[in-house]
Amino acid sequence: MASGSGSNFEALAQAIQTGTLNARIQRLVVNNPGCGAQQRAERLGIPVSVLDHRLIKNRRELDGELVRLFRADQVELVVMAGWMRIVTDVLVSGYSDRLINIHPSLLPSFRGLDAIGQALEAGVKVTGCTVHIVTEELDAGPILAQAAVPVLDGDDHARLAKRIQEQEHLLLPRALAELKPTWRQG
């Protein structure tokens, strides 16, 4: 699932292609038609479904559509690789312990929107990224993996975001590779 540029999605696809991650992407779901993630998936020959959040106003209804789609595809694990929507209990319960998110902070610090801006505002010297299991409480699920990124003198939002994203591209495939033996047991 993705909403934006799709760089984390493509990092997963590349990890699969190189054999770093033994998995298969059954489809990408985007909620922002024409976004970079959709373009990347189409270029890679990966099926894409578009569930435009502007046309489905009710978040629970959107999440219900996601669950139906994933079950029809017999999806075992759902990865939110830049999904910029808060999910409801419908999706969380439908994929309990099998819904994974990557967040641009060292959780539990800087949960929610604009974690990078929050870190800069707080003046921390280290931030990073976290892969975690999604629960009903925003960015509060069990942590699977983290990577630290120093905040350098003169960092602005764009520079820090770029360095965090570089770590996300490494961390997400690694965390999924470590998790894979356990996800079929749930």
Predicted features and spans:
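N-terminal Rossmann-like dinucleotide-binding module
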Residues: 1-36
